[in-house]
Amino acid sequence: MTENHTPSTTQPTLPAPVAEAAPIQANPAPSASVTATAAAATAAVNNAPSMNGAGEQLPCQWVGCTEKSPTAESLYEHVCERHVGRKSTNNLNLTCQWGTCNTTTVKRDHITSHIRVHVPLKPHKCDFCGKAFKRPQDLKKHVKTHADDSEIRSPEPGMKHPDMMFPQNPRGSPAATHYFESPINGINGQYSHAPPPQYYQPHPPPQAPNPHSYGNLYYALSQGQEGGHPYDRKRGYDALNEFFGDLKRRQFDPNSYAAVGQRLLGLQALQLPFLSGPAPEYQQMPAPVAVGGGGGGYGGGAPQPPGYHLPPMSNVRTKNDLINIDQFLEQMQNTIYESDENVAAAGVAQPGAHYVHGGMNHRTTHSPPTHSRQATLLQLPSAPMAAATAHSPSVGTPALTPPSSAQSYTSNRSPISLHSSRVSPPHEEAAPGMYPRLPAAICADSMTAGYPTASGAAPPSTLSGAYDHDDRRRYTGGTLQRARPAERAATEDRMDISQDSKHDGERTPKAMHISASLIDPALSGTSSDPEQESAKRTAATATEVAERDVNVAWVEKVRLLENLRRLVSGLLEAGSLTPEYGVQTSSASPTPGLDAMEGVETASVRAASEQAREEPKSESEGVFYPTLRGVDEDEDGDSKMPE
């Protein structure tokens, strides 16, 4: 009895899981699909028991079709080929007749995508939880529930094997909280310092252990200055080579301030190899820092990539070329420092001004200027400023001295050295005075002789103040005020015809009785005419901007020349070019001026040739063996042996 009762109790329990499983599998279908109707959901529910049956026969519920398929794939292909058809075979049907569904589309792709709602075919699986979906758009909506859009990337619809890149999470493990947790469970243990990843929190950069993942990422650290694009560096390199070639061929006059400024203008907008160390073209790249290395944590275990070199400059072949180029650059520096236009634009030629350039020291040599941190002094010849004059680097420096070397005393560029030889004494003066010497304004010819007309500077100043253009300093209180205003004298005899009020003492005088003559006429114009005041203010602003632009351009030229000289000196110290190479090329060439600079290396080439001629003489004098004479050297025509 127990044996017969046991199967009787087990048989009724078999349909129970099937009846309960039907609504469980039918619930995702209407929630996952948006365009399916209620009839399509009912058809999917009715199809569930037949799918779970013992024979797994899936009947086609198309109107008038009784065919059954063993798998969902075959059923889907049957509906698409038999009932939907194709346009090429003239049997295209764009209306769904599955059960009571009458959905109509406009394209075949739309109707075939709609049929997936009815067919229990779920080829699209979720990589996080393993859930399958019928359509790719349903999977895309489901993936958004796992993480934020900024942290996930759903698999592509056409990816057939997504597990190759991101292995599926094994059953029984909790769902991932972000996109990369399940495939790198073994890697996350390396980041012991990082908290477990959560929503809306930054995560360390992951790295997949399988060979299908991406490699390490390296960030090259820049040092000092941005490298820029290689094309820009190549342009600057070529421009610098062309500039050195122009120096060798004397294409422009280094003594002309305009020519030097115009030639340097083409180099200021380019990226030149100017750094404190070697040129960036001759440096190797810094060691990259690896992010997320496989050795655990953030490591830098990557080999250093090799550096690259630019070809040598064609216009700088020998050491003599570098020396001569440095001499030309020094000459260009002196031209910029000694130019009258620059002196006038910098405000040195202002009346009574004593200017000392902050970045220069007065020297008696032709060496390049040395920079210092001292401030620029603009000292005026007045009594309160007399103490500041003593702090000048050169006590014997005359007034209106340009900010340059001591060549101003001998180059006839100083306006003081023209009309008098003892106005600005040289350095042999024993006891210099506390106050700077001022040039004597004798006549108009001597005044204008020191300043060329091109500079546009003011003539040498006399003992007048430096603020004569400011009216507020000319008129002080208690001076130039009239004792009796003219307006009051003209109106005092007029009869008062105004209506009297109750209190005559409280009557306020009219505006015509208020005399404005207490204000100086020179000052009243500025306060009464706002348009004139604004025009003056605008003109002053424009003048300041123009002067600032001139000063900025001058500073850029000075810095460019200093960087060029620093580059040349660095190449000379490196010793990459030997002087013997230049001597050999100059002596071996048929024309001695071919490899040398025109007008510069002529003396060195001649000296080298003379030295080469003298060497055979010295060798002949030191020979201890007898020399055989030729036949033509004998007077009798017979050759004789030496005695």
UniProtKB/Swiss-Prot annotation:
Keywords, sorted A to Z: Activator, Cytoplasm, DNA-binding, Metal-binding, Nucleus, Repeat, Repressor, Transcription, Transcription regulation, Zinc, Zinc-finger
GO molecular function: DNA binding; zinc ion binding
YPX[LI] motif 2 (motif): residue ranges: 625-628
Compositional bias (Basic and acidic residues): 484-509, 611-620
Cellular localisation: Cytoplasm; Nucleus
Zinc finger (C2H2-type): 58-83, 94-118, 124-146
UniProt-listed InterPro entries: pacC/RIM101 (IPR050806), Znf_C2H2_sf (IPR036236), Znf_C2H2_type (IPR013087)
Any GO BP annotation: positive regulation of transcription by RNA polymerase II
Residue ranges of the region described as Disordered: 139-161, 354-373, 384-432, 452-509, 602-643
Motif (YPX[LI] motif 1): 435-438
Induction conditions: By alkaline conditions.
Compositional bias of kind Polar residues: 402-423
One Gene Ontology cellular component annotation held by this UniProt entry: cytoplasm
Reported modifications of this chain: Activated by C-terminal proteolytic cleavage by signaling protease (probably palB/RIM13) at neutral to alkaline ambient pH.
Subunit annotation: Binds to DNA.
PANTHER family (UniProt xref): PH-RESPONSE TRANSCRIPTION FACTOR PACC/RIM101, PH-RESPONSE TRANSCRIPTION FACTOR PACC_RIM101
Function of the molecule: Transcription factor that mediates regulation of both acid- and alkaline-expressed genes in response to ambient pH. At alkaline ambient pH, activates transcription of alkaline-expressed genes (including PACC itself) and represses transcription of acid-expressed genes. Specifically recognizes and binds the consensus sequence 5'-GCCARG-3'.
Record-stated family: Belongs to the pacC/RIM101 family.
Protein name: pH-response transcription factor pacC/RIM101
Organism name: Penicillium chrysogenum
